[in-house]
């Protein structure tokens, strides 16, 4: 019935569904079947972004905004070995540079989710591998704020 377009809700008795909860498997199944997933907002954008990413959520780290210059490469090198799912905030002006850095430090095939304007009218989430996003964000005039969720190292 979900594939026919009916709207359903996923409710957990243990907090936000799919955060340290097997509900993420349902979210992943929906994503794999091209079913849109939305999340009711909480106090921050990072939890809804993680909840709808389809990436492992039992252990994660919130990195916020990466350093702009000093320490950026060092931090990315450290994070390239991180096994937990990582969550980043990014501005529209630096999104392409950050994705390029992710490509260089994490590799082209690392799975990511990019959410834009969560809980707003132009909310959008795209999922794939880092290499899938470079062309789509190069030389684009973007608006809005982004949350990037990156799968940890296997």
Where are the predicted features?
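Short gly/pro/ser/thr-enriched loop/turn and capping motifs at secondary-structure boundaries
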Residues: 17, 44-47, 120-121
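Short, hinge-like loop/turn segments at secondary-structure boundaries
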Residues: 2, 26-29, 53-58, 105-106, ...
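Class I SAM-dependent methyltransferase SAM-binding "motif I" and its flanking Rossmann-like core
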Residues: 25-82
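Short, well-ordered secondary-structure micro-motifs
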Residues: 21, 49-51, 73-74, 98-100, ...
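Helical mechanochemical/support elements of P-loop NTPase systems and associated helical scaffolds
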Residues: 15, 22, 68, 72-75, ...
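A contiguous loop/helix-start segment that scaffolds small-molecule binding in enzyme catalytic cores
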Residues: 3-7, 85, 89-154
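Structural detector of well-ordered beta-strand residues that form the stable sheet scaffold
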Residues: 11, 36-40, 87, 113
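Class I S-adenosyl-L-methionine
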Residues: 1-36
